[in-house]
Amino acid sequence: MDISVVVPVYNEEDSLNELFERLSKNLDSIGKKWEVIFVDDGSKDNSFEILMKLFQSDKRIKVIKLRKNFGKSYALKAGFDNARGKIIITLDADLQDDPAEVPHLLEELDKGYDLVNGWKYPRKDNWITVFFSWIFNKIIYFFSGLPLHDINCGLKVFRRSIIEEIVLYGELHRFIPLLAWRRGFKVTERKVKHHPRQFGTSKFNWTKVIRGLLDFITISFFLGSTYCPSHLFSITGLFIFILGGGIVGYLELRKILFNIYIAERPLFILAVFLMIAGIQLVFTGFLGELIVLVTESPARDYSIEKELYHHENT
């Protein structure tokens, strides 16, 4: 299989037929073997019923139905886990991103890149969405240095090796380019056409921005020590232990010089607390190291209710 397209679906019943018609037309023009994996993320409308009809009409379609709404990251992860293509494409189901841009992104990938991120330009959303997205992207660029204008664009093309090295949860789907870039993959972007939403309602809200920023802080904090937790915890613990020891040394010196009783002084209690906390952090680092060594892969964080696939796609 050359190409796997993963499409997360949540209450998009009105756009699915047109989406697949336009997507399949553009994929056929490429001349490679492809599959489309629709992941119904607990839709409340008739999305799954429409997907079943599409599945029956084309053998290149696979449908996964999650038991409830797990969120976009887990929907994508379910699709990635079932994708067989050497190249992975992600595309939202709302038709705001144009399927006609897929061949152009693949051309960019052939220039030697590992991931090509879409850049919705000009963006056809309301000003609040555009404003929050602009702020979000500026913050990501300022702290990470990744020169992308639209990191959260749902239209992405990347090599399979990327999904084999990153783990998605929470709101981390928006950081796929950053996670790949931090691991040494070549990442670029290309402007893509963007259309106003014609069907359904937008899933964007300000709480997603906040959750996304919190996930970014988590990534930035732990990424440097993911494979060696002792670097983060042990160094911090050692610093705290030395600080506590320094306070004890200072108080002991005052006792020797001025005969001051220190055992019940608040500063002495604080020093002992710091030393104990430092030791605990050091051992936490060692424990984290052990967990990394014995854990080969994370447990699946989503639950599949139904899977539809044709025998030749197994």
How should each PLM-predicted stretch be described?
Residues 20, 32-42, 64-65:
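Short beta-strand/loop segment that forms part of the nucleotide-sugar
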Residues 14-18, 45-54:
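Acidic helix N-cap motif at the loop->helix transition within catalytic regions
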Residues 12-27:
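Short, well-formed alpha-helical segments that are part of the catalytic scaffolds
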Residues 40-49, 95-96:
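A conserved acidic beta->alpha catalytic loop
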Residues 53, 60-82, 87, 96-179, ...:
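Acceptor/aglycone-binding surface of glycosyltransferases and processive sugar-polymer synthases
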Residues 175-314:
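Hydrophobic helical membrane-anchoring modules
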Residues 2-4, 35:
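Cell-envelope/extracellular polymer assembly enzymes that use nucleotide-activated donors
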